[in-house]
């Protein structure tokens, strides 16, 4: 077993004041740069001869939590559109 000790955990992603990129900007970012915002590029990892496992684990969890926020946001939009459709019938 590998135990990584890290005092920083990305629960801050769920704080109201956490700045999350708009979903269209998010898509535009990785279309342009070919990696997720806030994540190192393949070239950066290669230049550093690898990465720190604990720090990368935190970044990956941060991205998972951001994805959860996007999913909830999209579901809210879907629900609102469904409501509009049912009231128009």
Regions found by a protein language model. Give the residues of each.
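Intrinsically disordered, low-complexity regions enriched for glutamine and histidine
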Residues: 55, 65, 73-75
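C-terminal intramolecular chaperone/autoprocessing and neck/assembly modules of extracellular spikes
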Residues: 1-56, 77-89
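A detector for long, heptad-repeat alpha-helical coiled-coil rods in eukaryotic scaffold/tether proteins
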Residues: 53, 57-60, 67
